[in-house]
Amino acid sequence: MQPDFEPVIERKFHNYINCIEGVYHTGQRDMQRIRISIDAFNAGFKIKHIGEVLYASVKNEFDAVVDKCEVVIYTDPAECTRVRHEVAIPIFDKRDERLDTLTDESVDVYYSCILCQAFSPSHVCVVTPERLGLCGAVSWLDAKATNELDPNGPCQVITKERPIDENLGSYEDVDEAVQKFSQGALEHVTLYSIMQDPMTSCGCFECICGIEPFSNGVVIANREYAGMTPLGMTFPEMASMTGGGVQTPGFMGHGKHFISSKKFMKAEGGIERIVWMPKELKEQVAELSLIHISEPTRRRGI
């Protein structure tokens, strides 16, 4: 099987696990949360059943490309940590590096992604080379591979032949696609603005960016951050304002790698508008080699 298909299958785990009665899954990559209800546990549900569901679902849906499948579930915390750092994260980094030479201008099409509509029926991600899905797990190349595997699936081609405002990232083609895939709930979406018709969010975002009115800047909180933000809200409280497939000007969900993109909040001035991030997130962003930070921004400590 081609390695390009691995993230496609991996992201489908979200749907497969949520099809189990009494089991809830959210998140992606190495930031996932699975909840098992008391009723499911009392009915005899075991961890091994997750593996059985994944095995059967992968073999059923991807039989054209998957010849053999094996599911190994780790429950020992130390072993989970080892596998995460020695196996998973290096693989994720390699996937992200594939996009280093691609820009939004260098491709002819973008892709929609509606994998999360089970939670947010009106949410539609528009995936471009420089703006990955807000979950952080679906890049432009992943969406392309998903479309090749299943032309009628969750990732559909969006042309970009009729620009309205390229600074905002506004296209007639994108608006038409969003209207179609949101069943008419959305009419306009911009790709590079947090204030004017921002992209909607479901609940799987890696980060949330929100306007901080006193500084006229923005703060960004990542999912792992459990503290209070300068907005007086925690990440879950910000999520309640941002998710659900509703456009909320001034707030947007996004992947961590989008922060390093030149298209991040391009319409509002980009990363120089960031006034606060948790230390952990700042260190992660600093490791992204593509990020360009101007000298005035460096002096402010961003």
Question: Residues of each region from the PLM?
Answer:
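Short recognition patches in nucleic-acid-associated and regulatory proteins
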Residues: 123-126, 213-237
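Long, charge-rich boundary regions
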Residues: 146-198
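Short metal-coordination and nucleic-acid-contact micro-motifs, chiefly zinc-binding Cys/His arrays
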Residues: 109-112, 121, 131, 195-203
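Cysteine-rich micro-motifs
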Residues: 129-139
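Long, charged N-terminal interaction/targeting segments
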Residues: 1-73
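Single conserved hydrophobic/aromatic residue that forms the stacking wall/gate
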Residues: 291-302
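Secreted, propeptide-processed cysteine-rich mini-domains
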Residues: 71-112
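Short metal-binding segments enriched for Cys and/or His
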Residues: 141-152, 241-248
